[in-house]
Amino acid sequence: KNPVAPFEAICRKKMITIELHLESETLMVHADMEQILKTLQKQIQNDFPDAPSTSYEVKYVHPDLEEHLSPAFYLTPPIDTLSPNDIYINRHANMGGLELYTTLAHEGFPGHLYQTISFAASSPDPVRHLLPMGGYVEGWATYAESFAYRYYQPETTDGQFAWLNRSLNLCIMSLLDTGIHYNGWNQARCATFLSQLGVTDTAIQQEIYQVIVEDPANYLKYYLGCLQFLDLQQEARELAGDAFNLRDFHKKVLAIGPCQFPVLKQAVITSYSS
């Protein structure tokens, strides 16, 4: 089965190049980031359980830090106050349109902010807040982000196209991550791999290599974590059959909270098996 077949089909259907499509500005643009988050909270209601009421604020990264920080991030609040819930946007990334929309979904609803307050509402043992479950946390945010591509403009395939592109990029970076830190690829081997995929600019190849070398297994948290949630959802669908409800599935996953994926799978599958 060709994993990029849907991606190629959309390209043929629209009769456009990938570059032209991704640079298109025909998608709606939101100027108010807090309004985007409010819109997302309404859009997720059919697919995700209700989130506890909370306050949040969208802020900009200080100009002195823009070149050194991520395009966006959610600042996890102290466990004893659960506030403030701040999402920071880096203006240096110059995000807008679909990119900004899906980024706020990743960091806000139904991503990090939503998952954090939902887990806290279950009154977990405090020690669980100390356990760094990066695969669950970043995997959930990436999985949740994928829904925003459909919410953004549901009447077209634009969102599906963009998500496939995002997924392929994460896959490529994850393969490089594994190649470098597990198989021992050097910069020349990575350059060959990237060239085979059409990335031939040596400066870009070097930059990608350096980013991955400095942060081992980072991309795996996002991409493999997301795939774990997608696989778990598929297995739950097969067990539940026509009785499967996506909202209930997400409720089970959120109630269990951040943990190792074998633990999560056992708990979720057991609930469907019984």
Predicted segments, located by residue:
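N-terminal maturation segment of proteins
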Residues: 1-274
